[in-house]
Swiss-Prot record:
Its main location: cytoplasm. Belongs to the peptidase T1A family. PANTHER family: PROTEASOME SUBUNIT ALPHA/BETA. One of its GO terms (cellular component) is proteasome core complex, alpha-subunit complex. The 20S proteasome core is composed of 14 alpha and 14 beta subunits that assemble into four stacked heptameric rings, resulting in a barrel-shaped structure. The two inner rings, each composed of seven catalytic beta subunits, are sandwiched by two outer rings, each composed of seven alpha subunits. The catalytic chamber with the active sites is on the inside of the barrel. Has a gated structure, the ends of the cylinder being occluded by the N-termini of the alpha-subunits. Is capped at one or both ends by the proteasome regulatory ATPase, PAN. It is found in: Cytoplasm. The lineage of its organism: Archaea, Methanobacteriati, Methanobacteriota, Thermococci, Thermococcales. The keyword Cytoplasm applies. GO terms for molecular function: threonine-type endopeptidase activity. GO terms for biological process: proteasomal protein catabolic process; ubiquitin-dependent protein catabolic process. This is Proteasome subunit alpha. The keyword Signal does not apply. The gene is psmA. Coiled coil: none annotated. Keywords: Cytoplasm, Proteasome.
Length: 260
């Protein structure tokens, strides 16, 4: 008879808690997010910016066809990490809910309402048999009365942030936000900070491998950052990073000289 680990039953069942209070399938869904492409969001007084990593695995793929920032409504967008097929289902559901709200009430859906509906769906997939948790997290951002930025977890939990990252580069990006984010940040600095945080998580950051979109309170419509502007921001950031590395090396050498 094959040896069966004690936790095997809890491991396979979606709706059964382990003795220490965990749902293993939810934890595994979170692991899918941790291995996914990095996505970041930064909020400023009058808007929000999203930036995502585009993992283009073949030179034959058309980069322009590989979208990672999805428009939900004119004023709301989402950036996923994890299993993109799962994220697509959530995005389609969010679009449907946004249309239903607009037809019912004659006005754009508040982001908080939409986030709660999506997280209700996610939570339901941790509670019933015959389904599995969504292996995707979403950054959902937009403007109504004010700019808003939310992270949705595979468990159905959600959090509002000033600046946040999901995916494999979360820890690196969050450390950069902790160091550089400030409450009075403006549009240009917010876009630059988002690109900086994302670039720091990539081995070889390029404009082709990054997608950026933003929205402002004035226009209340999402815009993708043009390729030329993205390259300009990225070149400035890479040059600043290079100069910082040179300064650090010089400091190290000066300390070395003092020791001899």
């Amino acid at each position: 008879m094959a040896f069966v680990p004690p936790q095997a039953g809890y491991d396979r069942a979606i709706t059964v808690f382990s003795p220490d209070g965990r749902l293993f399938q939810v934890n595994y869904a979170r692991e899918a997010v941790k291995r996914g492409a990095t996505a970041v969001g930064v909020k400023w007084k009058d808007g929000v910016v999203l930036a995502v990593e585009k993992r283009i695995t073949s030179k034959l793929i058309e980069p322009s066809s590989y979208e990672k920032i999805f428009l939900i409504d004119d004023h709301i967008a989402a950036a996923p990490s994890g299993i993109i097929a799962d994220a697509r289902v959530l995005v389609d559901r969010a679009r449907l809910e946004a249309q239903i709200y607009r037809l019912t009430y004659g006005e754009p859906v508040p982001l908080t309402v939409l986030v709660k509906k999506i997280c209700d769906l996610k939570q339901a997939h941790t509670q019933y048999g015959g389904v599995r948790p969504f292996g995707a997290a979403l950054l959902m951002a937009g403007v109504n009365e004010k700019p808003e930025l939310f992270e949705t977890d595979p468990s159905g939990a959600y959090f509002e942030w000033k600046a946040v990252a999901i995916g494999s580069g979360r820890n690196t990006a969050m450390a950069i936000f902790e160091e550089h984010y400030r409450d009075d940040i403006g549009k240009d600095d917010a876009i630059k900070l988002a690109i900086l945080a994302l670039a720091k998580t990539l081995e070889e950051p390029t404009a082709e491998g990054i997608e950026v979109a933003y929205i402002t309170m004035d226009e209340k419509r999402w815009k993708k950052l043009p390729r030329e502007e993205l390259e300009k921001y990225l070149n400035e950031i890479l040059q600043e990073v290079k100069e910082e590395e040179v300064e650090e090396k010089q400091e190290d050498y000066s300390e070395l000289d003092q020791n001899y």
